[in-house]
Amino acid sequence: MALRAKAEVCMAVPWLSLQRAQALGTRAARVPRTVLPFEAMPRRPGNRWLRLLQIWREQGYEDLHLEVHQTFQELGPIFRYDLGGAGMVCVMLPEDVEKLQQVDSLHPHRMSLEPWVAYRQHRGHKCGVFLLNGPEWRFNRLRLNPEVLSPNAVQRFLPMVDAVARDFSQALKKKVLQNARGSLTLDVQPSIFHYTIEASNLALFGERLGLVGHSPSSASLNFLHALEVMFKSTVQLMFMPRSLSRWTSPKVWKEHFEAWDCIFQYGDNCIQKIYQELAFSRPQQYTSIVAELLLNAELSPDAIKANSMELTAGSVDTTVFPLLMTLFELARNPNVQQALRQESLAAAASISEHPQKATTELPLLRAALKETLRLYPVGLFLERVASSDLVLQNYHIPAGTLVRVFLYSLGRNPALFPRPERYNPQRWLDIRGSGRNFYHVPFGFGMRQCLGRRLAEAEMLLLLHHVLKHLQVETLTQEDIKMVYSFILRPSMFPLLTFRAIN
C-alpha cells in the first residue's frame, strides 16, 4: 500500500520541474573527470526483499513507471535498483542509449521472459529472436531482417495491411452512418484489437481471419481468446521464479500452457497450409512474410514457426494501445486532429494508387505516432546486459551488469522535450536533422531493435490515415488517463470515443 500511496502523490505533482530537468539533462557536462566506481552510484532506497515480496503478493508492479520516474527526480539520471537477488542500473538520457549501442557486441544480450521460455522448453519448441541470445539469435536475426524489417519487405507487405485498414475504416463508417445522428459512441478497443490481429495475420500468413467487417470463424475466435489468456497469465507469472510459482500458481501455469498450445497449433496449421501451396506451385506474386521465409529455406520450418509466433504475440497489444492513445489525444486536441486530416486528404489519391507512399507522404501523422510513443511508451524500458565495461554518467559499469533505459522518464524530461505534458507532433518535425538520434527509441536500438517495428508502424499509420479521412473523433474526457505497468505500459481504463461522419 505504501508503494501505491507514493505513486498517487507522484501523479498529483507536476512532471520534472524545468530547473531539475535541466540538471538531469546537463549533469554529464559537469561531472568530475575521474570516473567514479560502481559502488559510488546512488542506490534506490528500500529493502530489496520486501519490495519483491510486495510485487509477488500483488501479482504485478502497476506503478513501476511512476516510482522510477520519482527516483530519477530524487537521485539524478542514473541509479542502482535492487530487486530480490537481482540488481540493475537505471538510466534515462539519450546519451546513455548511444553509449550502450556503441559497446554492443555481435550478440547483444537481454533478459528472457521466463513464462514464455518455460513453455517452449517443456513442449520442445524452438525460441525465436525475442527470446534468444548468442550466436543462434544472430543466425536467425540476419535471415529474418530482409523479409520483415527491410525497406523492401515493407514495400511488399504494406498493401496487405492497407487493405485491412480500409476495411476497418469502411466498417466503422458504415456503423456511424446507420445511426440517425450520424455519430457513434463506443468502446473502440475490441475493434482495434481485432484489426491488429487481422492485419498482422494477413501480412505474416497471407490469410484473413474475418475479424474486420465479417463474421469470424470459430478457429479465429479460439485463437483470439488464446492470445488474451496468454497475455493475462504472462503478467501473473513473470514476477515470480517458476520454482516457486509452480506451487503457488499451478492453475495459472496450466492456463498459460494451454493458451500457447492453441497459438502454436494455429501457427502450425497456417504454415502447413502455406507449405502445401508452395509444394504445388511457386506463387507468381508476393503472398506473405512466412511464404517468403519458406521459399528462401534459410531457416528451418520450426524456426520460422517460432519467430512467426513471437511476431504474432508481439504485434497485438504493442500496436493496440498506441492506436488507442493516439485517437484519445486527437479527440482532446481537435486542432492537431484537423491538421492530420488535411494531410491525409491531400495525400489520399496518391496513397490510394500506391499504398507504399503512406510512409513518405504523411510526415505529420508519423510525427503524431512518435509523440504518442513519447508520452505512452508501450515497452516501459529497454535493456542490455553490458558485454564490456563502460562509463555511464561518469560511473564505471562492469561487464555483465543489467542496464535499463526507462523510456517513460526519457520522454517526459523537459530538458529534452519542452512542455513534455503537451501533445505536440510538430516538435518531431522541428528537430529533424538535428542529430537527436536517440530521442525516439520505443522500438529499441541497434541490432536488437524490435523485429516487427515496421509492421507495427504500418498498421498504426494506415488505420489512422483511413479513419481520419472520413471520421471526426471526439471525447468528453479531458483528464489524463492513468497508465499502469502490466508487462507493457497500458491504460488502466479507456474512455468512450465518439466517431462523427465528416461531410
UniProtKB/Swiss-Prot annotation:
The keyword Metal-binding applies. It comes from Homo sapiens. Pfam families: p450 (PF00067). GO terms for biological process: aldosterone biosynthetic process; C21-steroid hormone biosynthetic process; cellular response to hormone stimulus; cellular response to peptide hormone stimulus; cellular response to potassium ion; cholesterol metabolic process; cortisol biosynthetic process; cortisol metabolic process. Its EC number is 1.14.15.4. A cytochrome P450 monooxygenase involved in the biosynthesis of adrenal corticoids. Catalyzes a variety of reactions that are essential for many species, including detoxification, defense, and the formation of endogenous chemicals like steroid hormones. Steroid 11beta, 18- and 19-hydroxylase with preferred regioselectivity at 11beta, then 18, and lastly 19. Catalyzes the hydroxylation of 11-deoxycortisol and 11-deoxycorticosterone (21-hydroxyprogesterone) at 11beta position, yielding cortisol or corticosterone, respectively, but cannot produce aldosterone. Keywords: Congenital adrenal hyperplasia, Disease variant, Heme, Iron, Lipid biosynthesis, Lipid metabolism, Membrane, Metal-binding, Mitochondrion, Mitochondrion inner membrane, Monooxygenase, Oxidoreductase, Steroid biosynthesis, Steroidogenesis, Transit peptide. Residues 1-24 form a transit peptide. InterPro entries: CYP11_CYP27_families, Cyt_P450, Cyt_P450_CS, Cyt_P450_mitochondrial, Cyt_P450_sf. Changing residue 368 to D: In AH4; abolishes steroid 11-beta-hydroxylase activity. PANTHER family: CYTOCHROME P450, CYTOCHROME P450 11B1, MITOCHONDRIAL. GO terms for cellular component: mitochondrial inner membrane; mitochondrion. GO terms for molecular function: corticosterone 18-monooxygenase activity; heme binding; iron ion binding; steroid 11-beta-monooxygenase activity. Pathway: Steroid biosynthesis; glucocorticoid biosynthesis; Steroid hormone biosynthesis. Changing residue 331 to V: In AH4; abolishes steroid 11-beta-hydroxylase activity. Changing residue 159 to L: In AH4; decreases steroid 11-beta-hydroxylase activity. It is linked to Adrenal hyperplasia 4: A form of congenital adrenal hyperplasia, a common recessive disease due to defective synthesis of cortisol. Congenital adrenal hyperplasia is characterized by androgen excess leading to ambiguous genitalia in affected females, rapid somatic growth during childhood in both sexes with premature closure of the epiphyses and short adult stature. Hyperaldosteronism, familial, 1: A disorder characterized by hypertension, variable hyperaldosteronism, and abnormal adrenal steroid production, including 18-oxocortisol and 18-hydroxycortisol. There is significant phenotypic heterogeneity, and some individuals never develop hypertension. This is Cytochrome P450 11B1, mitochondrial. Changing residue 141 to Q: In AH4; uncertain significance. Expressed in the zona fasciculata/reticularis of the adrenal cortex. It comes from the Eukaryota. Changing residue 196 to A: In AH4; decreases steroid 11-beta-hydroxylase activity. Changing residue 116 to G: In AH4; abolishes steroid 11-beta-hydroxylase activity.
